[in-house]
Design a protein with these regions (language model features):
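N-terminally biased helix-coil "hinge/interface" segments that flank
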Residues: 1-219
Length: 219
């Protein structure tokens, strides 16, 4: 943690601190372990590889600008629970990089959002059954999620549930590819690592990602 006064004086030190905090937490929970981590939030997902210990980045940048400060070796992709699904010019289902964000959020939040998101796809498929109440202000609605995804289903000529599954598959493939980049393309076998998730949407995708990468352990 950092005090408000220190944060004001050294604001640059807060850059990418959220993803770094999750990575440090995973390493402390499972010290000296081989881990692949993914932090899936509303707009993006951060992935990293820990081979016994956390690796500092040799260089880092934010929005194309170099950061002249210490950073961890993280890779970020534009896929999160709020990523918006759409039909591209070729008539195919696509996902992101646009996001519904925290406000108005996914359609299923019933806070004014109307665009179909990854979270809405989970709601349509019943993945939140028994856990629909997020707070006093947010009650998840599978009906609202279905209304948002239905136009995509009609455009694709597919059942609603298949369209929802397709949205989730797209999100999974984006994250799986990012995990392959930090492992296979660097000479590591994912099967030698445990997949560890955090972030609001991480648990919804953990097992599917582990299976697609041939990983035997998921936390």
């Amino acid at each position: 943690t950092i005090s408000a006064d220190k944060a004001a004086a050294r604001a640059a030190h807060l850059l990418l601190s959220g993803p770094a905090g999750g990575l440090i937490g995973a390493n402390q929970c499972f010290p000296h372990s081989n881990l692949m981590t993914f932090d899936m939030g509303g707009t993006s997902t951060d992935v990293a590889l820990i081979e016994g210990s956390i690796t500092p980045a040799t260089s880092a940048e934010l929005d194309g600008l170099p950061l002249a400060m210490p950073a961890l070796d993280l890779t970020t992709i534009g896929a999160g629970g709020g990523s918006i699904a759409w039909i591209n010019e070729g008539g195919l289902l696509s996902l992101g990089p646009a996001s519904a964000g925290a406000s108005p959020g996914p359609a299923c939040y019933q806070q004014g959002g109307s665009k179909p998101t990854v979270t809405d796809a989970h709601a349509v498929l019943g993945h939140f059954e028994g856990a629909e109440t997020l707070s006093d202000d947010i009650q998840l609605s599978s009906e609202a999620a279905a209304r948002a995804i239905q136009p995509l289903a009609e455009a694709l000529g597919m059942p609603l549930s298949d369209t929802a599954s397709g949205i989730i598959d797209l999100a999974n493939e984006k994250m799986a590819q990012a995990l392959r980049v930090i492992s296979i393309q660097r000479g590591f076998d994912p099967a030698d690592f445990a997949l560890t998730c955090f972030g609001g949407a991480g648990g919804l995708h953990l097992c599917s990602l582990a299976q697609s990468l041939g990983m035997r352990r998921a936390v």
